[in-house]
Amino acid sequence: MSTDATLSFEEAMEKYDPVLGFEVHVELNTKTKMFSSAPNVFGDEPNTNVNEVDLGMPGVLPVVNKTAIESSIKIGLALNCKIAETCRFARKNYFYPDTPKNFQTSQYDEPIAYDGYLDIELSDGTVFRVEIERAHMEEDAGKLTHMGGSAGRIQGADYSLVDYNRSGVPLVEIVTKPIQGAGSRAPELAKAYVAAVREIVKNLGVSDAKMERGNVRCDANVSLRPHGRERFGIRSETKNVNSLRAVEHAVRYEIQRHAAVLDSGEPVIQETRHWHEDTRSTTSGRAKSDADDYRYFPEPDLVPIVASREWVEELRATLPEPPAERRKRLQADWGYSDLEFRDVVNAGVMDEIEETIAAGATATVARKWWMGEIVGRAKNADVDPGQLGVKPETIVELNKMVEAGKINNKMAAEVLDGVLAGEGTPAEIVEKRGLAVVSDDGPLLEAIDAALAAQPDVADKIRGGKVQAIGAIVGGVMKATRGQADAGRVRELILERLGVEG
C-alpha cells in the first residue's frame, strides 16, 4: 500500500491512539543576529544583511547576543520551565546549502530552559496540560527558493536560490514531551498549543510572532499505537508548518496516513515530511536522523552561559501580564459574554479586535466586523483571519462611513471585498465603484411610488396598522436602487407617503 493512502479520521480513531510531539521554532526580534552584528530585519533585499560570521569565513569568532539570551530566559519562565544555572552551545553538523558553516550553532544536552508545562484550553473549555521537555537557543538557517518545477518545491526544480539574510537569526526551539491522551481531539490540541505559544511570545514582546513570515514555525511529530498498548509507534515529523490551520490539518492527515499504513501491515517509516497546503497532504522528505547523525559536540568558540539566580529573578519581574489573565481582563473590558469571548478566541481574532479597538472602534463594532465579516471570508479562503491582511484602521474607516450614512452595511461588505482584492482604501473603492448611498429624497420617492404601485395589497396592510409588512416595500426600493439606499430613510419616507405613524 502507498504510504500516502489514508483511512477516514473516524476509522483511525476507532483503532489507534495518537501520540503527538511538537518542536516550535520562534524567531526572536532582536536588532542583530545571534552571533554577529549583522541586522536582523525581515524583507530586505536578499543577501544584504550578512557578514563574515554568518558565512563562516576563516578566522572569525562568534559573540553571543545578550538580548537573545534574556528573551530566551523570558520564554522559559513563561512556559513554567526551570532555568539552567549554566548552559552551553553545541555544533550540530550537517551539510546543506542554507547552512554556509556546514554546522548550526545550537544547544544539545545543556539547554537554557527545561522541564516546563503549558495548560491549553480547548474550544469547549477543557484544559489539557502539555509538558515541555526543553527550550533551547540556536541560530536559524538561510532560506532556499526553488526555481522551476511545481509550486516552488524542490522536487523537479531547475535550480535553487539561497538568501543568507535569515542565516544566524536567533531562534528559540521549544520541544514538548510526548503528548498522550488527546484522542480524537489531537488536531484541535495541536492548533491550540501552537496558538498558545505564539500568544505567549507575542505577549512577551520577544518575537513578532507572524507565522506567515516564518517567525513561528512548527515541526509536528505524530505516531499511532493500538488502543491499550503502552509502547509508542514509529513517528513521522512534518516540518516547518507555518499556520495554525495547517498545523491542525497536518496532524489530522498524518493520523489518517499512519492508520492506513498500519492497517496494510506495512511498517511506518521514521522520516521527515513536507506539508502542502494546496492538496492538504504531506509528502516524504528524508529519513529522520538521530542525534548521533549530527555529531554534536560543544562549541569551542563560545564559553558557557551562566544565568545567575539574581539575573533570572530580575527578568521574571519584567514579565507582562500572563495571557490567561489578559484574556479575563479583555473580556471584562469589552463586555463580551463567555460564549462571545470564547468564539473570538477560537476564531483567533482576539489580538485583531484589541488592535481595532485601539484604532478607535468600540468593542461591539470591532467584534461585529471581525466575527461577522472577516472570519467568514478567512474560512472561505482557507486561511487564518490575520493572514487576510485587513488593517484595524480599515475597519474603523469603513464603520465611520456606515455611521455617517455614506454607505450602508451591504455596500460596506462590498468595499471590504475590494480592500481584500487590493483595489485601494475604502474611500478609493467607494469612488471607483460608485457605491455612495442615494441621499436625494427625489429618486427615493420615485422608487417608493413604484414599489407601492406594484404591491397595493401590502400598502393597504400598512395603512391598516400592520407596519411590519413594510419590509416588502423596503425590499422593492432597495432592489430598484441596487442596494444604494439608506434602508432607514426609505422606511421613514414610505410611512410618510402612506400617512402612517412610525
From Swiss-Prot:
A Pfam short name: GatB_N
The enzyme's E.C. designation: 6.3.5.-
Superkingdom to which the source organism belongs: Bacteria
Catalyzed reactions per annotation: L-glutamyl-tRNA(Gln) + L-glutamine + ATP + H2O = L-glutaminyl-tRNA(Gln) + L-glutamate + ADP + phosphate + H(+); L-aspartyl-tRNA(Asn) + L-glutamine + ATP + H2O = L-asparaginyl-tRNA(Asn) + L-glutamate + ADP + phosphate + 2 H(+)
Signal peptide annotation: none
Keyword annotations from UniProtKB, A to Z: ATP-binding, Ligase, Nucleotide-binding, Protein biosynthesis
InterPro entries given in the database record: Asn/Gln-tRNA_amidoTrfase_suB/E, Asn/Gln-tRNA_Trfase_suB/E_cat, Asn/Gln_amidotransferase, Asn/Gln_tRNA_amidoTrase-B-like, GatB, GatB_Yqey_C_2, Gln-tRNA_amidoTrfase_suB_CS, Gln_synth/guanido_kin_cat_dom
MF (Gene Ontology): asparaginyl-tRNA synthase (glutamine-hydrolyzing) activity; ATP binding; glutaminyl-tRNA synthase (glutamine-hydrolyzing) activity
Function: Allows the formation of correctly charged Asn-tRNA(Asn) or Gln-tRNA(Gln) through the transamidation of misacylated Asp-tRNA(Asn) or Glu-tRNA(Gln) in organisms which lack either or both of asparaginyl-tRNA or glutaminyl-tRNA synthetases. The reaction takes place in the presence of glutamine and ATP through an activated phospho-Asp-tRNA(Asn) or phospho-Glu-tRNA(Gln).
Subunit architecture: Heterotrimer of A, B and C subunits.
Entry protein name: Aspartyl/glutamyl-tRNA(Asn/Gln) amidotransferase subunit B
Provenance organism: Arthrobacter sp. (strain FB24)
